[in-house]
A protein has these predicted regions:
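N-terminal secretory signal peptides and thylakoid transit peptides that target proteins
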Residues: 5-31
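Structured C-terminal cap/extension of enzyme domains
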Residues: 38, 224, 242-424
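C-terminal segment of N-terminal export signals and the immediately downstream linker at the start
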Residues: 38-76
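Conserved, mostly hydrophobic/aromatic
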Residues: 66, 78, 100, 115, ...
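Catalytic domains of carbohydrate-active enzymes, especially glycoside hydrolases
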Residues: 88-107
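Glycine-rich, proline-tolerant flexible connector loops at the mouths of alpha/beta enzymes
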Residues: 101-118, 172-176
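Alpha-helix-loop-beta-strand connector modules within alpha/beta enzyme cores
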Residues: 116-130, 185-193
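Glycine/proline-rich, positively charged
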Residues: 138-257, 273, 288
Length: 424
């Protein structure tokens, strides 16, 4: 196979700029300074001004405006992937969480069904987001396919409307169609039809691809999308702030996911016995950016609700910044950024970023069922089964110095067993 998309091997100057020493130093410095490059005190003041407590909300939870939608959303959003008990979501509402994110492709629709049990009791307490998933559609989906998908979500959620529907996993690598899924006129027509019928209020886009900046910039500039759902953490690449600023200027809400930077060693020893956790520190770092609307994080228990809700309305301490800097120094060259820079170097067309993302779900997030189903949904050739006999062309192509081949072998060993069904 001839690889002509881009040179997968950075030139000497680029490799030098991204040397392990400099990379770790840059990561640690970014964490220590806080997001946006401002001082910690300035960030805390700006974030406090951007967020506010609602009159009838529980003490502690802060709220921000979701871009031009005008909707007030809790700083901590409920990620619905692992939920099994609707009472956990109702408990989150008691703690002030009003934003819930789900999808028909989460656990075969079980996430939506469980959330629907809670919505049937207290729909008025929640801002509900679901998704249009590429797993359900062909290469050129028609308008009715989108409408049928939304109707299925509404039935499972036991509601007559959702607040936001996200065109999910847009990007060049997600389906090989470039920006076609983002700008599909059938999707846009379906949204307008559903909106007129009162089934949805706002349209958004979400994605994991390495071309995140290009795709989401296009989404902002198109004027079609009211909300973006993007990864954002203290280990993400520095120019992501440009996208956040662009979205803010256009009035597009920016919701953050993948906020824990891999969650390796999620409760580090230096936090044990204190009033904060690593996860709280990571969430506070995200919320220090006054231009993000809120964040979503997977929640399955009341304990997690309490832990994550405590991150709202409180500024990072110096000890927390130092701990995140130590984490960055320890794990920066072990965590995939899903940038896709290494993929053109692969002679087997392995979906490297996807495989490592699903491995993260399995090993770090503990979401084993989701990881197994997602990996099984990849075409067999796109999985990492061919990596054992490959010398590892991906390794020198990684800008972050990751042992990519070893990570892929680990992923395939955990996820490669056959399953009877793919992601729904």
């Amino acid at each position: 196979m001839q690889r002509t998309e881009r040179d997968p091997h950075p030139d000497a100057s680029e490799r030098e700029a991204l040397s392990r020493r400099d990379l770790l130093a840059a990561a640690a410095a970014a964490v220590a300074a806080g997001s946006c490059g401002a001082s910690g005190d300035d960030l805390a003041a700006a974030a406090a001004e951007a967020s506010a407590a609602e009159p009838d909300a529980p003490a502690g939870m802060r709220y921000r405006t979701l871009g031009r939608t005008g909707v007030r959303v809790s700083e901590i959003g409920f990620g619905g992937v692992p939920i099994d008990d609707p009472e956990v979501l109702l408990y989150a509402a008691e703690r002030g969480v009003n934003y819930v994110d789900t999808s028909p492709c989460y656990r075969g629709g079980r996430s939506e069904r469980t959330i629907g049990e809670a919505l049937a009791k207290r729909r008025d307490r929640f801002v509900v987001t679901t998704k249009w998933c590429p797993h359900h559609f062909g290469k050129e989906p028609r308008k009715q396919v989108f409408l049928d998908s939304l109707d299925g979500s509404l039935e499972r959620l036991r509601t007559d409307h959702v607040d936001v529907v996200l065109n999910h996993e847009v990007g060049k690598r997600s389906d090989g169609l470039g920006f076609a899924r983002l700008e599909n006129p059938e999707m846009l027509e379906a949204f307008e039809t559903a909106k007129k019928a009162g089934k949805v209020r706002f349209l958004g886009a979400s994605g994991h691809d390495g071309d995140l900046m290009d795709v989401m910039t296009r989404a902002v500039d198109s004027g079609h999308f009211d909300v973006l759902l993007c990864r954002y953490s203290f280990l993400d690449y520095p120019d992501q702030q440009k996208l956040i600023d662009r979205a803010h200027a256009a009035g597009v809400g920016f919701v953050c996911m993948k906020t824990l930077a891999g969650a390796k060693g999620a409760d580090l020893e230096r936090f044990r016995g204190r009033n904060a956790t690593f996860k709280q520190a990571a969430l506070k770092w995200v919320l220090a950016n006054e231009r993000v609307s809120n964040l979503v994080i997977s929640i399955s228990s009341r304990r997690q609700v309490d832990e994550y809700a405590a991150a709202s309305g409180s500024a990072m301490t110096l000890a927390e910044r130092a701990a995140l800097a130590e984490y960055a120094a320890e794990f920066s060259d072990q965590i995939c950024r899903f940038c896709n820079r290494c993929e053109p170097a692969c002679p087997h067309d392995v979906r490297i970023a996807d495989a490592l993302r699903f491995s993260m779900y399995f090993h770090e997030y503990g979401e084993r069922e989701r990881a197994l189903e997602s990996y099984a949904a990849l075409e067999p050739a796109a999985r990492a089964g061919s990596c054992a006999a490959c010398p590892g062309y991906c390794v020198p192509a990684c800008s972050y110095g990751l042992p990519v081949r070893d990570l892929l072998l680990r992923a395939h060993a955990a996820l490669g067993r056959e399953r009877g069904s793919a992601t729904a």
